[in-house]
Amino acid sequence: MYSMMMETDLHSPGGAPAPGGGLSGQSGAGGGGGGGGGGGGKAGQDRVKRPMNAFMVWSRGQRRKMAQENPKMHNSEISKRLGAEWKVMSEAEKRPFIDEAKRLRALHMKEHPDYKYRPRRKTKTLLKKDKYSLAGGLLGAGPAAGGPPAVGVGMGVGVIPGGVGQRLESPGGAAGGGYAHMNGWANGAYPGSVAAAAAAAAMMQEAQLAYGQHPGGGGHPHHPHPHHPHHPHNPQPMHRYDMGALQYSPISNSQGYVSASPSGYGALPYGSQPHQNSAAAAAAAAAAAAASSGALGALGSLVKSEPSVSPPVTSHSRAPCPGDLREMISMYLPGGEGGDPAAAAAQSRLHSLPQHYQSASTGVNGTVPLTHI
C-alpha cells in the first residue's frame, strides 16, 4: 500500500519540489531515512528507489489523513487535492519538509554513491509498437522490402485462389523473393501505414481481377458491363483456357495463343507464329519490370495501348454450350478419370480459336471507346 502511494505521489500534479529545495533533478530512492527499504525480496533489493522530495514527505502524512476522512475517495482524486493544496502553501510552511527532503537525499547519496536514475519504460508505448509490428508480420511472411524483385508476375490468371495476391508487387518497387506475400506487402515494410497498405492492395487486386476476367493476349479492352450484345459475360472459360494451357501445353498448335498472363496484354497478336515464344517471354519480363516500378501505372499504359493493337481481334468468350459445359466439368475431375478427354477437348478448343477470333473481328473492331473503363 505504501509503495502504491509513493508511485502516485511521483505522478501527482504538485509533485515538483519547492524552488529552494533543489530536488527536481535528484535521482533515486529508497534505502534511507523515511524512504523505507525495498521489501526484503530480491527484486526490491536490486531496484533502489529514489529519495522523496519535499512534497512527498509532506503528502505522505496528508494522504493517510485524507484517506481516513474520505474512505470512498479515489487515490487519484486525493493526489489532485494534495497537489493543489501544496501549491498554495507558503514558503515558511514548506520549509520543514524541504529540510527533511535534503536530509533524505544526503543519506541516500551516502548509502548509494554510484546510483543513477534509470526511468522505467512506459508499457503503453511498447504496446503500440508491438501492435504495429504484429500487423506488419501478419500482412507478410516473406523477406523485407529491398529483396530481389518478384519475377513471376505472369503466373496463370485464376489458376489458384491465391494467385492474384501472390502476383501483386510491393509499392516500394521491390517485392520479396518468395510468394508468401499477402496484399503485396513485405514483412515489416511501412509498419506505420497499415490502413494505406490495405487500401492500395485492394485497389491493385481489383485491377488485376478486372483484367483477369477474360483470357489474356487480346487487343480489345475488357467491358465490365454485361449488357453488350457482342460478348456475353462468362468468366468461367478463363479457368479452362489457363488450366489447359498450363497442364497440356497446346501452345505450339494454337497459332500464337501464347499469352495467358496479365503482363502480356496487348503484347502479341493472335496471328503470330510459335517461334515468337521468346519474344513473348521478353515482353512479359519487360512488363514485370514496369509493374515493379508502379503496378497501376503499367495497367494504365496497357489500357492506352490496347486500341492500337493489330490485328483487331477480341478476347471475349462465347456463350457456353453443352460441349463447353462438359469440358468445364472434365477440367476439374481427377487426373486418372478425365485426363485424356480433357486434353483432347483442350486441343480441339484451342485449334478452333483462330477461326472464332477472325469471325468475331468482323463485327467488332479494336478501336472501341474507353469511356466504360
Swiss-Prot record:
Protein name: Transcription factor SOX-1
Protein location: Nucleus
A GO BP entry: negative regulation of transcription by RNA polymerase II
Main location: nucleus
Motif, 9aaTAD: chain positions: 327-335
Biased composition (Basic residues): 220-233
One annotated Gene Ontology cellular component of this protein: nucleus
UniProt free text on domains: The 9aaTAD motif is a transactivation domain present in a large number of yeast and animal transcription factors.
Positions of region (Disordered): 1-48, 211-241
Swiss-Prot/TrEMBL keywords: Activator, DNA-binding, Nucleus, Transcription, Transcription regulation
The entry's DNA-binding region: 48-116
Keyword NADP attached: no
Taxonomy of the source species: Eukaryota, Metazoa, Chordata, Craniata, Vertebrata
Positions with biased composition (Gly residues): 17-43
Keyword DNA-binding set for record: yes
